Design a protein with these regions (language model features):
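…primarily DNA-binding HTH/wHTH and HhH modules…
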Residues: 1-12, 244-245, 266-289
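Generic protein-terminus/edge-of-domain signal
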Residues: 1-58
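Short acidic-glycine-tyrosine-enriched beta hairpin
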Residues: 64-79
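Ligand-binding loop in jelly-roll beta-barrel domains
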Residues: 66, 80-104, 108
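Short hydrophobic/aromatic patch on the recognition helix
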Residues: 72, 215, 219, 263-264, ...
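Short, Lys/Arg-enriched, Trp-marked, Pro/Gly-tolerant hinge/linker segments that flank
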Residues: 118-119, 143-211, 221-233
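Terminal helix-turn-helix DNA-binding modules in bacterial transcription factors
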Residues: 198, 202, 221-261, 281-289
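Alpha-helical residues within the helix-turn-helix
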Residues: 206, 217, 221, 254-255, ...
Length: 289
């Protein structure tokens, strides 16, 4: 861990009540610039939310998962789900709030379509989706005067296109499952924060006060996987924003604690069945769709 790394600055929810979506304005936008190591404390609200960064990288943590979000990705957060946001790199955080009619989740047009939107999910962000989102009026409700009729009409047209684009956005399996058991939760959050700090479960166990055998059992019972497989998902998720910064493969491997690019490449092949160049290029290509 880098001793010169600044401490995380915790702040409260970023005035979501000033951007409340309604039937008249079903899709609201909020745009904020946040410094690295800022953490928005856990909170929830009664509407749906899409969190994305037009620049920089954020991490969204919910009860059952953690999601690293570079500009090519977004995270859907259903109504009422508690979540926290950590800024990994200086970011322009764009938040979309969705009014949710009773029985509907996300941009679904029917209760049947809502099934896939009842849980947090990572989505691809096309250039069209991002461009539409950036065109929405991101002004708060107060103390500003009510928007004009022309503004509302334009907002409704943009919202219709945005909701359609969200329905078309492909889900991406880059979320990191999180356990509920307290000891394992602490370990998992520490790994996500600094995945290259230790390579083995035994080394991480020394930091938690639980034995490696106990943690192995907890990984299986809580997450249905092994520590090695779970940590690989963390490393893959961390690799995506590094690739978005155009870092060479050797630098990405070193950042993630691998002794050589070939060792990193072997891990990627085992995990996703493709070489890292193809896996990471796909992540960048989706951003330009």
């Amino acid at each position: 861990m880098n001793p010169s790394r600044p401490r995380v600055a915790a702040i409260g929810p970023l005035t979501p009540h000033l951007y409340t979506p309604t039937p008249a304005r079903p899709l609201r936008a909020k745009l904020l610039r946040l410094r690295a190591d800022t953490r928005v404390v856990p909170h929830a609200h009664p509407w749906g939310q899409v969190a994305l960064s037009s620049t920089g990288v954020i991490r969204v943590t919910a009860p059952h998962g953690s999601y690293i979000v570079p500009p090519s990705r977004a995270v859907w957060i259903p109504p009422g789900v508690e979540h926290a946001v950590t800024v990994i790199e200086d970011a322009e955080l764009l938040t979309l709030y969705l009014h949710q009619p009773r029985g509907r989740f996300g941009p679904a047009r029917s209760a049947a379509e809502s099934a896939g939107w009842r849980q947090c999910r990572v989505l691809e962000v096309s250039s069209l989706l991002l461009a539409l989102a950036l065109q929405l009026d991101a002004s708060p409700d107060a103390p500003r005067a009510a928007p004009s009729r022309e503004t509302l009409a334009r907002e409704r047209r943009l919202a219709a296109l945005l909701l359609d684009e969200l329905r078309r956005a492909a889900p991406v399996r880059l979320g990191i499952d999180l356990p509920q058991e307290k000891r394992l939760r602490r370990l998992c959050e520490a790994v996500i924060e600094a995945p290259s700090r230790h390579a083995t479960l035994a080394a991480w166990a020394a930091d938690t006060g639980a034995s490696a055998r106990t943690l192995t059992r907890l990984f299986r019972s809580e997450l249905g996987t092994s520590f090695v497989q779970w940590r690989q998902q963390v490393l893959l998720a961390r690799a995506v924003p590094l690739a978005a910064r155009k870092l060479p493969m050797a630098r990405i491997a070193a950042e993630l604690g691998y002794a050589s690019p070939s060792a990193f490449a072997a891990m990627v092949r085992r995990s996703v069945g493709a070489p890292p160049s193809r896996f990471l290029r796909a992540s960048e290509g989706r951003q330009r769709v």
